[in-house]
Amino acid sequence: QAQQTMREKHILSIPIVDHERVIKGICFLNNGALEERQKLKLPVVMMAGGKGTRLYPYTKVLPKPLIPIGDLPIAEHIINRFIDFGCDAFHLIVNHKKQMIKAYFAETEIAGQITYYDETEPLGTGGGLSLLKGKIHQPFFLTNCDIIVKADYSDILDFHQKNDNTITIVCAYKHFTIPYGVITMGEGGDIADMIEKPEYSFLTNTGFYLVEPEVLDDIEEHVSIGFPDIVEKQRGKGKKVAIYP
């Protein structure tokens, strides 16, 4: 709970007191590992322009980045996580209900660390990145506005650089058990196969990436495109795209 409070309030330590309010110790943010994490100074780009239709009816009132998780909107939780690792420059690509997003963050302590890029039309999960051409000249984190990845971002950067990746896709391992027997039907209605409660494991795309700035130069302006299509384009050019599981 102390760690969560420090992240939300952007403070580095909290005193631990007993019932008589005598200090018994100090709890440091990230257990004192902040000094090392501050070395991670990369821009963060957040795709925050979608309508959030899968979250209806909530997103009919609030834009998806402002959907609350506890006391804070999810976008602020995401930003706080990056701040934990020393990131201090945030680029938000906005469209739907963008004035609400800007108004909210204007009242926060991190207002001066955020730059907005306004889409004039929906450009998909990748097209909006064309607005950042010439603005970013180093590797950057790219994240959806509805996913909190609890990983070591410094380790992701180390993996990205050691493998000379153009794009690193952060994936999550998922394991599912279908709670029913699954039947495969053959020709004529015969049973070709029958498996009781089969289990499947696979890697899923979290919507969290580490991207080299050269990728921005290949994105056409004012063209709607998904970031997975951008990934495929880079792979087609022989660029290295790797998975961080």
Report each predicted region and the residues it spans.
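Short beta->alpha transition motifs characteristic of CBS
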Residues: 11-15, 22-37
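N-terminal nucleotide-binding beta1-loop-alpha1 segment
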Residues: 28-67
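Catalytic-core segments of class I nucleotidyltransferases/pyrophosphorylases
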Residues: 140-141, 148, 154-161, 174-177, ...
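A conserved hydrophobic position in a structured secondary element of the catalytic/binding core
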Residues: 27, 96, 143, 210-211
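Conserved N-terminal catalytic core of the sugar/cofactor nucleotidyltransferase
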Residues: 11, 40, 72-145, 150, ...
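A short, conserved acidic/glycine-rich loop-to-beta-strand motif
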Residues: 163-173
